[in-house]
């Protein structure tokens, strides 16, 4: 191996020297040709026909010599950079045509497993055979396989296994040259629409059809508390009881109570019960510096007017009048 490398090194040096010599000769010939053409073009008087013919012959010879030198350089450059080993003798081919051509290898169906194929139905007129493409070399997390997608919609999977086909519905027709949305994008758009619907439903004025309206299921809106407008007032307490709070224009229902750190009085939480589904809330606590005063904090806005108090619970009809007996 060392001897072969040394011989290859000497051969490369010789080839480089030969390339340099041929390139230098070609450049000299080009320089001579340019000089000859410049002398011919700058002659003041018209040359004789014999002299003009001689100049044309000289230019042709110089051009041929220059071109041959550069061709030699190109051929030398094409020979460099290849393998160091020489080609072996060509084996004589037999006369029989059957012996020269290798017989195709055929394997039994049981030896080679058939690939799984997915056959899609043909797309609409907007998607023809012009949309054919091929995908190869896809690697999965557990194993790598090759798949190809042809223009007619058939997907070939390189994994071993039985042959199966799956018929899928055609893609929806598009307008204005826009491609159809993928399944993931369609799911995201549907989720965004549902989220918008839930948001509008949560803030609608009239909520009908149960706790979650007519959406056909539980609301998937975010449970995070939204920023609400707060308004705090101080009113005098009407009694020493915690449950007694001064009345206002709306009806309230207590739904919770929480102790306050540093105060012996708890804080009561109320929601508006004037109209079903109203988001207005308030919490009432005693002033720790002046127990005779109450601090009332309102959150949210009412979705109704104070006159709607009797709409949800209509008053009972008056009793029938008793007619005097004759």
Curated annotation (Swiss-Prot):
Residues 241-307 bind DNA. Residues 97-113 have a biased composition (Low complexity). GO terms for cellular component: nucleus. Residues 87-113, 204-225, 297-326 are annotated as: Disordered. Induction: Induced by abscisic acid (ABA) in aleurone cells. Accumulates in response to uniconazole, a gibberellic acid (GA) biosynthesis inhibitor. Repressed by GA. Highly expressed in aleurone cells. In seeds, predominantly present in the plumule, radicle and scutellum of the embryo. The keyword Transcription regulation applies. A motif (Nuclear localization signal) lies at residues 70-77. SMART domains: WRKY (SM00774). Keywords: DNA-binding, Nucleus, Transcription, Transcription regulation. One of its GO terms (molecular function) is DNA-binding transcription factor activity. Residues 314-326 have a biased composition (Pro residues). InterPro entries: WRKY_dom, WRKY_dom_sf, WRKY_plant, Zn-cluster-dom. Its main location: nucleus. GO terms for biological process: negative regulation of gibberellic acid mediated signaling pathway; response to abscisic acid; response to gibberellin. It is found in: Nucleus. PANTHER family: WRKY TRANSCRIPTION FACTOR 21-RELATED. Belongs to the WRKY group II-a family. Transcription factor. Interacts, when in complex with WRKY71, specifically with the W box (5'-(T)TGAC[CT]-3'), a frequently occurring elicitor-responsive cis-acting element. Represses specifically gibberellic acid (GA)-induced promoters in aleurone cells, probably by interfering with GAM1. The WRKY domain is required to bind DNA. This is WRKY transcription factor WRKY51. It comes from Oryza sativa subsp. japonica. The gene is WRKY51.
